[in-house]
Regions:
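Conserved catalytic cores of very large enzyme subunits
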Residues: 1-275, 292, 296-348
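Conserved phosphate/anionic-ligand binding catalytic regions in large, soluble enzymes, centered on
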Residues: 275-289
Length: 350
């Protein structure tokens, strides 16, 4: 994932200054009388064209040149105005955000020339004080985001206020398309989110746990412990598979700054511990699990309490594993796209 502000915080202004110089030179060479106001007006038109072309290039590159085995990379674009200082820089970020939303509303053409919704890059739009109320400075941008969601099912939304309460005053995007990192501070005691990574995920099938218990609550918790032990073993297999990996296997990732700046021949081991990277326990089927055990959904009275108890138990288990291993275990709501069918087939045989 990448924040637009992190990438574009100076680029738009650099382009603006370049175009001002070029337009002025062109007017002088052509012998055209001009004012600085006219120069800036023409330069601003070129800035907007460059933003449009740049956003379009990123969109099409992600779904063409960057694909592997016919699948686009799970990339998220994070649209967070407060990521940059107030003033010209934030206004420029708003211009880029506006263009991203407009192009997503339009969609991309498939091989038949039909405008379709691209799966990636995924978009996340942050709701903050200067864009959530009618009349606020960037309210029109939020209206555009809502139109985009109505047509293309993106962007997703993050409340800056709520996330800062939950994440020690930080607001940041997910990795890839869904998994959020835990809060981590570098050697200078500054929060770091970009450039970190996840060691892998193993998903717990809560429906399987419930069905295996035969609606016996005591048996449910016993089976849950057994399944969690199995998940931990699988997660540690993923961890040990990475341990000892030399940075030379992927220099762009480990040596040139995409994820770290390690020396040649150095292993990635120090990045696997202490919270720099995470490893995730996924869960799936909380609603169905609750409905089987309690006869109601996890959002209904009698079901909510049980569902929360399960979630707290999973969270506490991850904390316990983290203390035991010095590896940052996190809890993750698995999307379960292709695995849904696999899990459903497994449940037939219970």
């Amino acid at each position: 994932s990448r924040g637009l502000g992190d990438v574009y915080k100076r680029q738009v202004q650099i382009s603006r200054e370049k175009f001002i110089r070029k337009v002025r030179e062109e007017f002088e060479k052509a012998g055209i009388d001009y004012t600085e106001e006219k120069v800036r007006e023409v330069a601003e038109m070129r800035v907007r064209d460059e933003i449009k072309n740049g956003v379009q290039m990123i969109q099409y590159q992600v779904i063409t040149l960057m694909t592997t085995n016919g699948q686009a990379p799970f990339v998220t674009v994070f649209m967070y105005l407060d990521e940059v200082p107030e003033g010209r820089t934030r206004d420029d970020l708003a211009l880029v955000t506006e263009e991203v939303l407009k192009q997503r509303i339009q969609g991309v053409k498939n091989e038949k020339g039909v405008w379709i919704t691209p799966a990636f890059p995924k978009l996340i739009y942050v709701l903050e004080e200067d864009n959530i109320r009618e009349g606020s400075k960037y309210w029109e941008l939020t209206k555009l985001a809502a139109q985009c969601t109505a047509k293309r099912m993106v962007p997703d939304y993050i409340s800056e206020k709520i996330m800062k309460k939950l994440k020690d005053g930080n607001c940041y995007p997910c990795m890839g398309c869904r998994s959020f990192l835990t809060v981590y501070k570098d050697e200078n005691d500054k929060p770091k989110f970009y450039g970190r990574f996840n060691q892998g995920v193993v998903t717990l099938n809560l429906v399987d746990v419930a069905c295996s218990s035969g609606k016996d609550v005591d048996k449910f918790w016993k089976i849950l412990d057994e399944r969690l032990d199995l998940c931990k073993r699988a997660l540690m297999c993923r961890h040990y598979r990475l341990k000892g990996t030399p940075s030379d296997v992927a220099p762009i990732l480990w040596q040139n700054g995409a994820l770290a700046r390690l020396k040649k021949g150095e292993t990635i081991d120090k990045l696997l511990y202490g919270g720099y990277s995470t490893i995730s326990l996924g869960y799936a089927g909380l609603c169905e699990c609750t409905r089987y055990m309690k006869g109601v959904s996890h959002t209904q009275p009698g079901g909510t309490e049980f569902a929360l108890e399960v979630m707290h138990y999973l969270t506490d288990t991850c904390k316990k594993w983290a203390e035991e291993t010095n590896i940052d275990f996190s809890l993750y709501g698995t999307p379960l796209e292709s695995t849904t069918y696999k899990f459903a087939l497994s449940l037939i045989h219970i």
